[in-house]
Amino acid sequence: CGAVSGFHDHLRFIDEVIGRKPGAQTYAAMNILLLNERTVALVDTHVNDDPSAEQIAEYTVAAAEEMRRLNLAPKVALLSRSNFGTGSSASGAKMRRALELVRERAPELEIDGEMHGDCALDEALRLRILPSSTLKGEANLLVCPNVDSGNIAYNLLKTTAGGNVAVGPFLLGANAAVHILTSSSTVRRIVNMAAMAVVNADAVR
């Protein structure tokens, strides 16, 4: 969908015409940033204001599958202002429940949480706080507790560290290969996402 009009306007049309995949509860958006020293994906950057633990688990698994299609091995961190149970925040409890659900549905997925953003990207810090963490190395799929935190984190990283080089957003949960561009999309990103849609369409044939 084009870079004119709002994201949710396009999403409404997609929902009416294409709909969600069988069994999918919700849509979500994943953006990938090509930073100097790492490639990082963030979800959800555009859709869910206050997702449930079940919805977060669903689109975490979907985002990991999308990364594998791009030949990226997902290493997932569930983010919160709570750090492995150190805080009493609602987002921390929600992300801990999401972790349980993801481990039930995709036991092969390398994932841990809930954790601060610095712990997700700094293994030494993470292991100092939780030596038994099941996540090794740097996380490359950052799952945020709501769309506000996801969108803010994405735009800050894109501008300050990513040189405005980004891929996405990838729409997760739709019953066809379809993506929604944002008003800040460059020509390069439009071409990239058109190519991604073709790759996704070929994959489901």
Language model regions located:
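Anion-binding alpha/beta catalytic cores of soluble intermediary-metabolism enzymes, centered on
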Residues: 1-136, 140-205
